């Protein structure tokens, strides 16, 4: 067994995260860079240290999680969601939405601000999940630097954010109240059911093909009939019919 295999086995025991489901070359590069900075010589040495040092384990988990996020990322896709997709999923009931792998919260807050502006919507609830507890802590606070808000229209910024003395911006309570943040491992934990919309963007690119297929199936199963899965702009699903989905627009897939 090579030292990376030893590491992945130990990592799964310590964190519950199965690294064999992530693209190996990408993950190895990230981990090697981290353990070399910490002064370790091999995956084996690093694994032994992680077992004894909880702070190092937490830091490593934090560094390995991809936390690149901003409000209204790929703005045109959000316009499509508003104009073409919401009419497909609107019903007489409040919408049930899942922002999966929500990172530091920009995505679920973008969703909430967009939904709050819809006339005639009977309400909505957003479940926002991520594997990284530090990211979730930041998300719950809802405080961001101005650079995260570059794509936010001025009218939206004025309506839904309060500017603090240190030039940071805080999401208003009226938007926070409809979002529940929760720790969740996409690859291992149980999925809730009956979602009208699942947003999972810029996450699938990190997984192996077999892991991706498993996630597509599980997410399709979690959608209501006619519910929609919204993926990232580099994550087109080839042969979506295999998962019980049909294209609704570019990067949007509807359950049949």
Curated annotation (Swiss-Prot):
Segments crossing the lipid bilayer: none
EC number(s) recorded for this UniProt protein: 2.1.1.80
Coiled-coil features, chain-numbered ranges: none
Key words, A-Z: Chemotaxis, Methyltransferase, S-adenosyl-L-methionine, Transferase
One Gene Ontology term from the biological process aspect of the record: chemotaxis
Catalytic activity: L-glutamyl-[protein] + S-adenosyl-L-methionine = [protein]-L-glutamate 5-O-methyl ester + S-adenosyl-L-homocysteine
Enzyme class: transferase
GO MF assignments: protein methyltransferase activity; protein-glutamate O-methyltransferase activity
Domain called CheR-type methyltransferase: residue spans: 1-256
Protein's job: Methylation of the membrane-bound methyl-accepting chemotaxis proteins (MCP) to form gamma-glutamyl methyl ester residues in MCP. CheR is responsible for the chemotactic adaptation to repellents.
Protein's name in the database: Chemotaxis protein methyltransferase
